Amino acid sequence: MEPPLWQRLVAPLMYLLPWSDAIPLGFGPDGLFLQYPVLRPLVLPALPLMQLERSIPFGLGGLLLFFVLFLAVVRNPNVPYFLRFNALQALLTDIALIVLSIGFRLSLQPIAAGSLLLGTLSSAVVVAVLAILLFSLVECLRGREPDLPGISQAVRMQLY
């Protein structure tokens, strides 16, 4: 059964969460958005979410948003499955992105700060998250579940 139009329009908004966390990686010293200013308009859809995350003190905005999405959407059986699936998939993508970002900061930043290696890896992560966002957007608008290898299987195991 194909999800109704409102679900197909709301589901892609979930993927703005990992996109908002990938954007700072693109503004590093050799960041993608600094090298290619034509890509900067891609930041605009995530700005309201980034402002919301930063409006809560002590950096707890992202954590609060995570818990709201997880408890109010993913774990709520009254929310349609299509929205729950996409919310959890976006949250797992965001967790993977945060772990990568922390790994970059702890392992590569001290030894390769400002180097080509760090800039290349950061740009690759931004491009990967952008590809996930665009793929998920198209699949959601078509009314299909975006099938991300590894992540989608974990989502299905959690939701069933």
Predicted regions and their residues:
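Alpha-helical membrane insertion/targeting regions
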Residues: 1-160
